[in-house]
Amino acid sequence: VEGDRNSGEVRLAELVDLTERAYAGEPMADPAFAAFQQVIQRHRIPKAHPLEHLAGFRMDVQGYRYQTLDDTLLYCYRVAGVVGLMMARVMGAEAEPTLDRACDLGLAFQLTNIARDIVEDAQIGRVYLPAEWLAEVGIPEDEVALPQHRAALATLAARLVDLAEPYYRSASQGLRDL
């Protein structure tokens, strides 16, 4: 719905502005952003991380279409990988290898979430599976939620879970450092 998209864009612009102001050290009237400002300052969270996270939200608001696996992985990085990076910093991690593993954990979680929620997401107009994958099994993007495609979707969900496994293994290497 166009109105929803416009209101989403307006809200995103507000969040970007509040994020920029928090990083600029401006006094924050919003209690959530005042707390956010304390966290980013205390834990030296790079500004690029929350801005990247908001870019992931923008992909949803704009109805981004995922043509390739790289597109899907970019979304996963933006909505979950950078969350792993920020959380690792809050937990005191600074070493690049540890931060990389935290990012991998976020990617693994998001790939798993996508696999779990394929039909539910499609019912609200969000398809995170690569269009290339859907074409391989003959599912038009606008038919992902239809019951006749469940068997083919199960194979794609399994493929996503398989794709997540190396990220989980990588992440487990960094857990001891958190």
Give the role of each language-model region.
Residues 1-175:
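Acidic catalytic motifs of isoprenoid enzymes
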Residues 178:
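Active-site/pore-lining binding-face segments in mid-to-C-terminal subdomains
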